[in-house]
Each structure stands twice: as C-alpha cells, then as structure tokens.
Regions:
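Generic protein-terminus/edge-of-domain signal
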Residues: 1-56, 60, 75, 245
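A hydrophobic/aromatic-rich effector-binding and dimerization subdomain
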Residues: 1-20, 60-132, 142-154
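Regular secondary-structure segments
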Residues: 40, 115-129, 170, 174-177, ...
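Short, Lys/Arg-enriched, Trp-marked, Pro/Gly-tolerant hinge/linker segments that flank
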Residues: 101-112, 126-138, 145-175, 179-193, ...
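Alpha-helical elements of Rossmann-like donor-binding domains used by nucleotide-donor carbohydrate transfer enzymes
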Residues: 120, 136-139, 143, 168, ...
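Terminal helix-turn-helix DNA-binding modules in bacterial transcription factors
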Residues: 171, 175, 184, 199, ...
Length: 266
C-alpha cells in the first residue's frame, strides 16, 4: 500500500487499505483536478454530485474536476481502493472531452488488461525510487486514460440513481453560471418554494445550495483566469456582488488570489 503526493500534472497516486472505515474518516470534497478511483473491496455508497452509487468490486469511478463526491461506509468491512488525481491536460482534448463530460462508472472486474494498469502501479512503487516512480506513473496514467477513452466505446456504464429534482437543479446551475444564481432563481424556474429547493438540495448533496453555486462559479472563474481573462472581467462575468467578495472567496478556496492565478497560468 502507498500514497504519493506530488505537483501537476499528477497530484496523488495511492493504493490504500482501511480496516473498519467510519464516516468520520471521509469528508465530502471537490477539487480542480480529475480523479480515477478503482473500488477493490468494501461495503459503502459513493455520492458523486448527487448520484448515489453502491459499488461492486472493481468499479472504476471516473470523476471530472469540480465534482462533489464522498465515500459513505455502510459497515466496518475493510475498504481498499486505488486513487489517481491529475490534471485533465494530461490527455489530448478529444479523449478529455469523452472521459470527463460527466461522472462515469465502469466495472472492469472481467477486464484483465484494465486491471494490469493498477497492478503495475504496485510493481513500480516496490521497484523504483520515488522520483522514478512518479515519472513512470505519468506515462502509465496517460496510457490508462487513453485506454479508458477507447474502452468507453465498448463498455456499458454502470447505472446509478440521482433525485430528478436535483438533476434539474444541477442542470440549471451549470447552464446559468453567468447569472446572479440563487435559491430564488431556481425556485422560479422550477415553480417550487425557495425553502423546498434549499432543503432538497442540501439533503441530497450534503452541501448548502449557496456554497455549491459559489464554488461552481469559482471553478469556472479559475478556467477563465488560466485562459488569460482579467480578474475584474471574470468577477463581472460570473455576477459576483463585488470584487472584494470575489477576491475573498477565490483566495479561500484556491489558496491564491485571482491575480496570482492569472500570472501563473496554472
């Protein structure tokens, strides 16, 4: 078992085994990079942006950036997984668009070629120095992602469920990030009460609606800043109330100011 953290384009590679997992060990989270999670064993649910999934051994979760997700143990049964966190820029755009258009779950239990990639991670970790391990993993991960892209053409995604009201809310949020989004907006669009919209969203997503909207806007802002747009123009585009509010929220979430993000281009 191992856990290696690094800098872009590969942020984390791990193979973990947890005895007696508990809910307190796992928090809902989101991040600006993509994730592959191979569920090896355990008894749990995953919530991926409101999609509730009870995984089977060797379910591969393909999680786009800026997607809320968390692990919910159902019993103390031991939990084993592989996790790879990485920049989507690691693969060509045509594969990126296919892989990360939405969360996808594939079962690779009967696919020895798929499982070989993860077995190689263990072999590389036990054989190479930390520096050479990361170099080898970059190449292996790039190959794995391209392999995933081709396998998606012939594989049947695992079906999971999401509350249809939440599905509608998430669609409205994604389509209207450049508007002054809030619970009132969603309530009007869906012809529901504001309190009902807020309650359903928080119960299903385990995050407040206002916080979710703010963070989705910030991830969109991050992409525009990396593309060269000015911080002031990004603030106006995503309808933040004022620049100081945008600056404060951005720095708290990203760890750098919007201007620093633009200068770094990363």
């Amino acid at each position: 078992m191992f856990e290696i953290k690094a800098k872009a384009p590969v942020f984390e590679i791990s193979h973990k085994y947890v005895e007696n997992p508990s809910a307190a060990q796992y928090a809902q989270h989101t991040h600006a990079y993509c994730e592959l999670l191979l569920f090896v064993r355990g008894d749990a649910n995953f919530n991926i942006d409101g999609i509730l999934h009870h995984p089977k051994p060797y379910d591969l979760l393909i999680i786009p950036s800026a997607t809320y997700h968390y692990f919910i143990p159902r019993s103390p049964k031991a939990y084993e997984n592989y996790v790879l966190d990485f920049s989507p820029d690691l693969v060509p755009i045509e594969h990126r668009q296919k892989l990360f258009a939405k969360p996808t779950i594939l079962n690779v239990g009967d696919d020895a070629e798929f499982r070989r990639f993860f077995e190689l991670l263990d072999l590389y970790h036990s054989t190479y120095s930390p520096e050479d391990f990361l170099l080898a993993c970059r190449s292996l991960l790039r190959e794995l992602l391209i392999f995933c892209s081709y396998r998606m053409d012939s594989s049947i995604p695992v079906e999971s469920t999401r509350n249809p009201l939440v599905e509608t809310m998430l669609g409205l949020i994604s389509e209207n990030l450049e508007k002054p989004l809030d619970a009132d907006f969603l309530a009007r669009e869906m012809m529901l009460s504001k309190s009902y919209v807020q309650n359903v969203f928080s119960q299903e997503m385990h995050i407040g609606l206002k916080k979710y909207i703010t963070q989705k806007k910030l991830f969109a802002a991050q992409a525009d800043l990396a593309g060269g747009m000015s911080a002031a123009d990004v603030c106006a585009k995503y309808e933040f109330s004022d620049y100081s509010s945008f600056f404060r929220h951005y720095k708290k979430m990203m760890g750098v100011s919007p201007r620093e993000k633009k200068r770094s281009g990363a």
